[in-house]
């Protein structure tokens, strides 16, 4: 009986050891990817923050009517959701999806969705939520090519009045163990009161290149979301894999203890049988 138990435990030890090898390797890969993603995030964040300041000044000095500032009259809301293509990253994707569900459940008829990432597409399909567009297989270091494609689609939907408000839903990266899901409204822009002591002269007039400025700003914003999302994804995956490796180590310790106890019990039983047999022959 003890022999059968020993065989079963030995199989479990082998299985858990193999799993630990996988989780440890994935943790190391995620650590390397996170380092790269954080560097990319820092570079993009500087560019994005500078562009935000410039755009704010430009918008405040636009006096003519403009749909990107005044709105286009549509009641439809567009949510652009940033998720991952791969899994095994803890609650990274489900937290984003849950935030979207809570946001659109009050007004489903006027809510439209663009999803980025295989996992987001899979979750939305299960929930029966249709999408306007899907973008998958985004590289580990997103480029302006991906950002431009999405930005142009957003501008097309907004300028044609198919949507009246645009929100970006993504995970803001703070540290490997802390990320926060944000829902940021990017269209229409919010105009602030002009500062009394500030004047900027534009040549040519700003109205001539507002569309180009808008597209560049949206590209920078989407690239910033991509950078935060990739860093958050890899941080979540690294934390999840390190946690899985620690759990595997704890399980192996318990299995080793069980194995040694059973083996000791089997040896004791065998000795008792030998002694008992010898006593019976006297």
From Swiss-Prot:
Membrane topology type: Peripheral membrane protein
Record GO cellular component, one term: plasma membrane
Cell compartment(s), UniProt: Cell membrane
A single BP term in Gene Ontology: proton motive force-driven plasma membrane ATP synthesis
Keyword Nucleotidyltransferase: no
InterPro entries in the record: ATP_synth_F1_ATPase_gsu, ATP_synth_F1_gsu, ATP_synth_F1_gsu_CS
Top-level taxon of origin: Bacteria
GO molecular function: ATP binding; proton-transporting ATP synthase activity, rotational mechanism
A Pfam family: ATP-synt
This protein's UniProt keywords: ATP synthesis, Cell membrane, CF(1), Hydrogen ion transport, Ion transport, Membrane, Transport
Cited function: Produces ATP from ADP in the presence of a proton gradient across the membrane. The gamma chain is believed to be important in regulating ATPase activity and the flow of protons through the CF(0) complex.
Family: Belongs to the ATPase gamma chain family.
Quaternary context: F-type ATPases have 2 components, CF(1) - the catalytic core - and CF(0) - the membrane proton channel. CF(1) has five subunits: alpha(3), beta(3), gamma(1), delta(1), epsilon(1). CF(0) has three main subunits: a, b and c.
PANTHER family linked: ATP SYNTHASE GAMMA CHAIN, ATP SYNTHASE SUBUNIT GAMMA, MITOCHONDRIAL
Protein name from the UniProt record: ATP synthase gamma chain
Source species of the chain: Clostridium botulinum (strain Loch Maree / Type A3)
Name of the gene this protein is made from: atpG
